[in-house]
Amino acid sequence: ALFNEWMLGMGALYIKKQLPAVATLFTTHATSIGRSIAGNNKALYAYMDGYNGDQMAGELNMEAKHSLEKQTALHVDCFTTVSDITARECKQLLDKAPDIVTPNGFEPNFVPSDKEYDKKRMAARRDLLNVAEKLLGCPISPDAFLVSTSGRYEYRNKGIDVFIEAMNRVRTSGRLQREVVAFIMVPAWVRDARADLKEVIDKNIRTTSPMQMPFVTHWLNQMEQDKVLNYISHAGFTNSATDKLKIIFVPCYLDGHDGILNKPYYDLLIGMDATVYPSYYE
């Protein structure tokens, strides 16, 4: 029986106790306390050897998660993780080195063949540019440079703040010759797809002025508290027609049924010219 991440730790421990004939495997892609250390602006990697997982769990109010994760790692038949970096973290913070490292990867057929690749890339670019034009109320060059970041909504750990700041520096550098559209594809607390944006997309209505909040494709709960939108505003982005660089927040799971782009994540990712993942915490 295979269990992934601390949330399923109770299941692993239950099977271990009640059905000892069934082998148990526990895989972690990170540690809850490591993520918390990094998310609280502490230097995780520079001082890794000095951290005590139990002590930090108490300091950061993480005892329950950390305890479950640690006990699961200690008592399953086989404990695995996905990288050498995380293996070091597990050994230091959970007091248990993984029995084996199973590196993350993709199947050989993950990237489409040449003709299929070109077809999917063109379709993705068409849809991304169409959404941008409808939201911003201005034409976007077909040759625009599309760049994105994505991942869990961990504002600092995943470098979302770094991505926005980098885009802002590029925007204000005065050196841009080519139009750039930057997408932040990070699931947030979504309320629903924007009805105004959905309508103009579905009816193929040409918009000539930016929509309200021309930075986001879906309405959020408590938008005024969203870190991404607040930093975009603080940085001075306007997404006006004269800006060489526009930034758009796509705050939903791209499962093909989000109401706006309606394509799975990987079918959109293929349309990007560059992707940026300035992650601090793996």
Residue ranges and their predicted role:
Residues A1-E282:
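Catalytic cores of nucleotide-sugar-dependent glycosyltransferases that transfer UDP/GDP/TDP-activated
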